[in-house]
């Protein structure tokens, strides 16, 4: 007899991120549902279980977060496109007659652990189907775990048993929580012991059976490891508790409840037809499939000849699809004239082709530049990038992987791509480009692609290649200072509290604040008192311990997020960090940055800003920082055509003081700093569709006062109100909004019946044309500055772009001409009804330029 338990959340998440973006003709997202159903069917057919269940997380105050508020804090919220698919998954499971088991406040792993614990001694063979390795701790003589991953509609599995887990994972099943207690788990934000890596942890658990035994034998462990263990003891045991699956939830489930039952084929058929899952309907033999029409898939991939490319003269076509194959470290080119796929690893030959008059159609051109390690891109021409073209058409896609683009734009059969991915992909590139070009023309996006996004590619490539120098010694010193401040704060907090406690534990902190120190309770959760940032800010002046706790949280974030991450990112050869600028990473058109993310370097608090001191130029160079002044408000003035706003910017009036004067009904000379501060919050808040609640919270006034403030603002700036209302209406009528340069952002939930979702969508609609236009202007400016630096044969390089700020590393003797160039080109990037103003500063580190 066999029981199969599916980890619903894990399988669903992995299907969503692994599969291309799929939607029905009614725009229902379906990729996660499709992948999930295929996994369920595969293992129902393969395992033929007598009993079956699907475990899901269930919202509620999470038990682990009650102990450690940062647990999974690094996880992004569930994407909207995944959220809307969950009800369909549940409907399908009901139609399959598969029980859904969940328990409020606990994760699917805990439900699985409790089911295993309840039934493992009943003689059953138990198979756990999941996408992650957390459940390996549940392995037993009759319990196996199959780790599955989805690629298109193919499911790949990795089988773990109690016998092979040590060989494959490095520790025994019952040591998995101990292992995570030592090394941590980045995906769940489990801290572990600082400085203990995988090999050290495995060695320790080879010698000692558990975390407890390790700490009982500290005197036998070499000093370098022992010191780390001693310093991280509290975090180690906290991490073990977080990593240990709960196996005693009172699920109130009987084995008979899980018995495999007949499917409700009629209901199953209805749902699958609604989701347009033709292949699954056919696979299940559901009878009425012939009544429904589906779009014909394009599978007409020609048989092609394959040859080694030896000379550019072999190419006859005027347009050549060209792609880099990572696994083989070589390039594939398709010549339609001779119906030949040419293959080469000769980088000089590829560089020659990129410089030729032939039109090259590629995917991810910037990556190809990196593979060729080009010194410069001056003579590269006639290159098209389908990834960037697809981003221009839809900046809200969840994936820009090549296969997903084939499916979305060519309706290509997934199987056709899979049969010979490299050959099929390079052959289809030309078709894909033709379709994208047609849509770009249809949507009037030519300027956005040809003058902004495509010419930005070489700019970003050279920025990534150049990198940003980091003073490693200064960073290490700064890290030590932060660590010392944390230790000092801990000591002060414990002295005031009169006892040691885990400051990171909301439960223990709430006991100290609200029970021991008797501070007023601001907010409660299901499991106790809230200690979130909003609560602590309200308690700031109520007790001396509260500011210390806020400082402690600030410094620990600086340490873990910035100091430690940055140290690891320094290239040992160049002494610089080489971030990746992601051109397709945001819905607004802004650039994103990763590995490391240099766009989230702190700007909000003084101590965090100090980390900018470690970013320095090379010797004999200086950093030049150019920052647009109030660009989003200037764009708002331009788009709304509000006369008062336009007049203020044209006459170089302090816009925040003018707004304060208008709203408070005083002369501009009589505006107090407090009035200006409140007006500033309104000015910037309006751009983001701020509500009276949000404004009241931000400037600490009553909600009624905030509403009056906003109403007065709109009375004085009526065309701003008119613009915002018209923009929301346009979004509701069309499903998208546009920037000044025709960048389109689709707005989900703009017609939602859920008030919160609709309100959020309306705020996005208000802000996106403004923020997106600012991003487009910055990109135009970057291109112009880059070109002028080249034209003047200057050695200066653009090294970073963060929101409204551009940073250039210039030899000292070039700094004056560079400052002139950057100010002129940025201020004249585009002509608006108001002037663009750029503030230019210089310094010997990034901090000095601000």
UniProtKB/Swiss-Prot annotation:
The keyword Nucleotide-binding does not apply. It comes from the Bacteria. It is an enzyme of class 2 (transferase). InterPro entries: 3'-5'_exonuclease_dom, 5-3_exonucl_a-hlix_arch_N, 5-3_exonuclease, 5-3_exonuclease_C_sf, DNA-dir_DNA_pol_A_CS, DNA-dir_DNA_pol_A_palm_dom, DNA/RNA_pol_sf, DNA_polI_H3TH. The keyword RNA-binding does not apply. One of its GO terms (molecular function) is 3'-5' exonuclease activity. Residues 470-850 are annotated as: Polymerase. Disulfide bonds: none annotated. Belongs to the DNA polymerase type-A family. This is DNA polymerase I. It comes from Caldicellulosiruptor bescii (strain ATCC BAA-1888 / DSM 6725 / KCTC 15123 / Z-1320) (Anaerocellum thermophilum).
